[in-house]
Amino acid sequence: MNLSPIGEACLIAREGRRLRAYRDSVGVWTIGVGHTSAAGPPQVAPGLAITAAECDAIFARDVAAYVAAVRSGLTAPVGPHAFDALVSLCYNIGPSAFAGSTALRRINAGDAAGGAEAMLMWARPAAILGRRRTEAEQFVTPYAA
């Protein structure tokens, strides 16, 4: 399964799209669609600026790694809406945290509702709780046909 166009749009809306480096809510230098140095090149530093095309290329590379992490950890069948929500969660908390998350354990055990509830455990800083709620809602709500 891949990130759907709806999932990609939701993820970009949640992360934002900025062409100049900025500090995120916890002080990490970030650029593009939530790209940090921890995700790989480019290294983000004060004053860094990128073009829209560079932003798109960085996002494509970054999101592919998070899609792969979700595919690797997810053993339960889920719909596109749920897969997209998990990619968004993984993109924000990182592949290692996602792999060890209660949310993933519950989902893989067949407890989708419990998995959605466990997504809300990832609520630090507090400003991220709104995002977690929308991810959990996306996880349990199939896309309209």
Mark where each language-model region is:
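Structured, non-membrane catalytic/scaffold regions adjacent to prosthetic-group chemistry
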Residues: 82
